[in-house]
């Protein structure tokens, strides 16, 4: 089980990223617009740099919903490989069966 503080930190990053997503994407699209001069784009670059670091989507860690484990998370289920194997073994994941041949 991961530390509660690290799980909460990741959740706050997700909220901050969602709330500032539109503003961040607008600034980025204007910054990469080559029809604007550098003098026009420079204030936009500064405005983007002044946004909180945790509002960037790259700072969000993909964590297991059950345990908070940061590694080995299967995206389709949002669960770590260990817990997924355990749940599949019990038959709690519909439509997934253990392979045997």
Curated annotation (Swiss-Prot):
Cited SUPFAM superfamilies: Glucocorticoid receptor-like (DNA-binding domain)
Keywords in UniProt for this one? Ribonucleoprotein, Ribosomal protein, RNA-binding, rRNA-binding
Region span, Disordered: 1-26
- Position of the signal peptide: none
**Basic residues bias located where?**
10-22
Keyword Ribosomal protein (UniProt): yes
GO molecular-function annotation terms? Answer: rRNA binding; structural constituent of ribosome
- Specify the superkingdom: Bacteria
The answer to whether keyword Repeat applies is: no
Record text on subunit structure and interactions: Part of the 30S ribosomal subunit. Contacts proteins S3 and S10.
Mind telling me what this protein is named? Small ribosomal subunit protein uS14
The organism named in the record is Rickettsia prowazekii (strain Madrid E)
């Amino acid at each position: 089980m991961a530390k509660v503080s690290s799980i909460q930190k990741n959740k706050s990053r997700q909220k901050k990223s969602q709330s500032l997503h539109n503003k961040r994407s607008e600034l980025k699209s204007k910054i990469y617009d080559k029809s604007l001069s550098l003098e026009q784009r420079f204030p936009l670059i500064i405005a983007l740099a002044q946004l909180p670091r945790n509002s960037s989507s790259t700072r969000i860690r993909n964590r297991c919903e059950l345990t908070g484990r940061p590694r080995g998370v299967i995206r389709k289920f949002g669960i770590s490989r260990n817990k997924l194997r355990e749940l599949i073994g019990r038959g709690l994941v519909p439509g997934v069966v253990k392979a045997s041949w």
